[in-house]
Amino acid sequence: GIPCGESCVFIPCITAAIGCSCKSKVCYRN
């Protein structure tokens, strides 16, 4: 539930490497 400061509209979350995932076009962690 914490925004990772990255969007995932056109590309996947690079922050997935630290546990972020794409939700509602924004990368979130927990």
Curated annotation (Swiss-Prot):
Probably participates in a plant defense mechanism. This is a cyclic peptide. One of its GO terms (cellular component) is extracellular region. InterPro entries: Cyclotide (IPR005535), Cyclotide_bracelet_CS (IPR012323), Cyclotide_sf (IPR036146). GO terms for biological process: defense response. Keywords: Disulfide bond, Knottin, Oxidation, Plant defense, Secreted. Belongs to the cyclotide family. Bracelet subfamily. Its main location: secreted. It is found in: Secreted. Disulfide bonds join C4-C20, C8-C22, C13-C27. The keyword Flavoprotein does not apply. Pfam families: Cyclotide. It comes from the Eukaryota. The keyword Manganese does not apply. This is Cyclotide cter-P. PROSITE patterns: CYCLOTIDE (PS51052), CYCLOTIDE_BRACELET (PS60008). The presence of a 'disulfide through disulfide knot' structurally defines this protein as a knottin. It comes from Clitoria ternatea. There is a cross-link at G1-N30 (Cyclopeptide (Gly-Asn)).
